[in-house]
Amino acid sequence: MKFAILFGGNSYEHEISIVSAVVLKKVINQNLEFIFCDEERRFYHIPSEKMNSKTFSTKAYKKEKELFIKQGGFFSKGFLKENKLECECVINLIHGRDGEDGKIAALFEFYSIKFIGPRLEASVLSFNKELTKLYAKSVGVKTLDYTILRKNQNSKEKLSFPCIIKPARLGSSIGISIVKDEKDLEYAKDVGFEFDNDLVVEEFKNNIKEYNLAGCMINDEFVFSIIEEPKKKEFLDFEQKYLSFSGHNELIEADLSEELKEKLKDSFKKIYNPLFKGALIRCDFFILDNEIYLNEINPNPGSLANYLFKDFNTTLNALADQISLEKMIKINYNFLHSINGQKGKL
């Protein structure tokens, strides 16, 4: 399977997406194409040998061929014709806005481009942490109790401390604060509201265990990664999350009973099927008093959580093989023909 990796985007997670693409280049042992979406949402074809931080930090990518999108794929302008970028499937590796909020999914479905990533409805529900909690509840998966703070609205909710405050539509731990008492609350709200108009507030629990599980559905069968118990302090910061998906830190397979492992997989299945078909996702769970709680859904996990799979390349290729394009509707204009055949034509 010939893949193209789409990365970048107009997102607070733009740089982590670049790092993710560089890491995935090293992981996927096959011929790849690289499509960079810059902050102006223009697409560039990046040669494999130029996939490094300097290409992007110095804006040298602007010297590369610019791509445009139309029915069936990405194209560049040649001297006498348009040249199509040769790939069979695009991997959506844009983290945060653009890649995970539904814009790319809608664009690819509209232009009949085969891709690995969340579809429109899945993107919308997983991008917003408030909607994620409502969705999880609807499919029978528990989440921690929460409060929503909205910008420019005076909330009368009484918060308990310590608590954790998260922007509703951001990942990579950006804008997150742990608030230990009321005197730190206003500052934490100011930080969060710099990134989002809605904040999710949860009680911070010291005795909670976190576990990550990635997977996908291939030919109606689930393929799971190992279950990871990440090393962390109070929460994973930006740097820790980079280290985790780049394979530079020690991977700890969770020491759990078979019963709890099956409970985690069962919760994953409820979240994934059928909404996330076509995507390889990672779900982050909490376990508290032997109960499973969904923390968040990562619809485009960093480097697609390759470090959690024993045979990542086989899984990725098998997933791509079974993705099909949306069936096009045949328009025959019979109704308009019938009108034209009558008196008083339209």
From Swiss-Prot:
Its cofactor is Mg(2+); Mn(2+). Residues 133-327 form the ATP-grasp domain. It catalyses: 2 D-alanine + ATP = D-alanyl-D-alanine + ADP + phosphate + H(+). It is found in: Cytoplasm. Keywords: ATP-binding, Cell shape, Cell wall biogenesis/degradation, Cytoplasm, Ligase, Magnesium, Manganese, Metal-binding, Nucleotide-binding, Peptidoglycan synthesis. Mg(2+) 2 binds at E296, N298. Mg(2+) 1 binds at D284, E296. Pfam families: Dala_Dala_lig_C, Dala_Dala_lig_N. It comes from the Bacteria. Pathway: Cell wall biogenesis; peptidoglycan biosynthesis. PROSITE patterns: ATP_GRASP, DALA_DALA_LIGASE_1, DALA_DALA_LIGASE_2. Binds 2 magnesium or manganese ions per subunit. Its EC number is 6.3.2.4. InterPro entries: ATP-grasp, ATP_grasp_subdomain_1, D-Ala_lig_Van_CS, D_ala_D_ala, Dala_Dala_lig_C, Dala_Dala_lig_N, PreATP-grasp_dom_sf. Coiled coil: none annotated. ATP binds at residues 159-211. Its main location: cytoplasm. GO terms for molecular function: ATP binding; D-alanine-D-alanine ligase activity; metal ion binding. The keyword Magnesium applies. GO terms for biological process: cell wall organization; peptidoglycan biosynthetic process; regulation of cell shape. HAMAP family: Dala_Dala_lig. NCBIfam families: D_ala_D_alaTIGR, PRK01966.1-3. Belongs to the D-alanine--D-alanine ligase family. Cell wall formation. This is D-alanine--D-alanine ligase. It comes from Campylobacter jejuni subsp. jejuni serotype O:2 (strain ATCC 700819 / NCTC 11168).
